[in-house]
Regions:
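Conserved helicase NTPase catalytic core signature
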Residues: 2-150, 159-165
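Conserved helicase motor core of SF1/SF2 NTP-dependent helicases
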Residues: 135-150, 157-371
Length: 371
């Protein structure tokens, strides 16, 4: 019931239900549908006004749409939805999650994503990167995310299917340039191949170009690292390098007792040459290696700024991607490979950080292809 002036205008419940059904059949997004419902109710009222001999115009339409009565109906039957709060509720409410996930996720999968201790609100929630793309997906279902003309994605091999969808929404009516190396895919949910990624991006027919020639890493180093490809990226051909240097690769065996001396020697040899140097190792081993170097008086720094001015940097393998150094010592490849579900991918990243010289230092047996 809407009161305007001395007249009252009534829109029956059944008619409003019909308006809602029509919008749902069109498949409009939630936010757009909410706005359209207000307009359609106003249109029904204006039709009744015209039938009663009145002459409403666009200003009347807007005024009716904004009335307290119309807004109350829209709020009741098509409430506003906040994407952050929607995902928060979904991950906190087992019954709601089960209802939404019926036929899509089994009980174990629902348990994996459900929060055991629901937060009080969005501000106290411990959001993850995976949760962020759920919020982005929800946001697009509510209000269409506008497309850009062109999107460039680097390190695309690390994108999950949901992250691909988030990128795809931003180039839905535009174009994209996607760059990556499947051998360096170190995230647990990374897509398996490029056709799968392009499908999730919404660009299944996009052109695929293989970049198989390198200039940064010497051939001897690249050939050694490429031995891992059959295990980490089956079907990906080994890249070729134009640079050759017979002395660019050294594989050094040590015993647990001789590891400190061997590490110090490898670092000293690297520091005797011009350029930057780094030790890359499994994250959990870095502290022990730092103590070995400290006891020997070898100055070193870290990525977070400790040891400013030192030419030698200790790098956890989880942060090595995208970095490059003139000289690299990869310590204990077997520990790198065993420390993560994609440890061999991380090892491949570590082995390809050197642009001049690579030393592989090990006490534990090397992963099979590197022996």
């Amino acid at each position: 019931m809407l009161t305007r002036g001395s007249r009252r205008w009534r829109v029956p419940r059944e008619e409003i239900a019909g308006l809602i059904g029509g919008l749902r059949e069109r498949g409009v997004r939630h936010g757009a549908g909410r706005d359209m419902l207000g307009h359609r109710i106003a249109h029904v009222v204006l039709t009744r006004m015209e039938a009663a001999g009145e002459a409403p115009d666009d200003r009347t339409h807007d005024a009716v749409r904004r009335t307290r009565e119309v807004r109350a109906v829209v709020d009741a039957v098509w409430p506003a939805v906040n994407p952050v709060r929607l995902v928060l509720r979904l991950l906190s409410d087992p019954e709601l999650l089960a209802q939404a996930a019926e036929g899509l996720l089994d009980d174990d999968e629902q348990q994996e994503i459900r929060w055991d201790s629901p937060p009080r609100g969005p501000g106290s929630a411990r959001w993850s990167a995976a949760d962020a793309v759920l919020v982005d997906e929800a946001r697009d279902l509510i209000e269409r995310i506008p497309s850009l003309a062109h999107v460039v994605v680097d390190e695309a091999q690390d994108l999950s299917p949901m992250e691909c969808r988030a990128v795809g929404r931003r180039c839905a009516t535009g174009s994209a340039t996607v760059l990556g190396d499947l051998a360096q895919a170190t995230t647990p949910a990374a897509v398996a191949d490029w056709p799968q990624m392009l499908a999730h991006l919404g660009k299944p027919d996009a052109g695929l170009r293989l970049l198989d020639t390198g200039y940064r890493v010497p051939r001897q180093i690249l050939d050694y690292a490429s031995r891992l490809l059959p295990l980490i990226a089956p079907g990906v051909p080994a890249a070729r390098s134009f640079r050759q240097d017979a002395g660019s690769l050294a594989v050094v065996s040590a015993t647990p007792g001789s590891l400190p001396a061997a590490l110090v020697q490898a670092c000293t040899d690297a520091l005797d040459r011009p350029g930057s140097a780094a030790v890359i190792a499994a994250d959990a081993q870095l502290t022990a290696l730092a103590k070995m170097l400290g006891r020997a008086g070898v100055a070193h720094g870290t990525l977070d700024g400790d040891g400013p001015g030192a030419r030698l940097t200790l790098v956890p393998v989880s942060l090595a991607k995208g970095l490059e150094f003139d000289h690299v010592i990869v310590a204990e490849p077997a520990r790198i490979a065993a420390a993560h579900s994609r440890g061999l991918h991380q090892l491949y990243v570590a082995l390809t950080r050197a642009v001049s010289r690579l030393t592989v230092l090990y006490t534990q047996p090397l992963p099979g292809p590197l022996r």
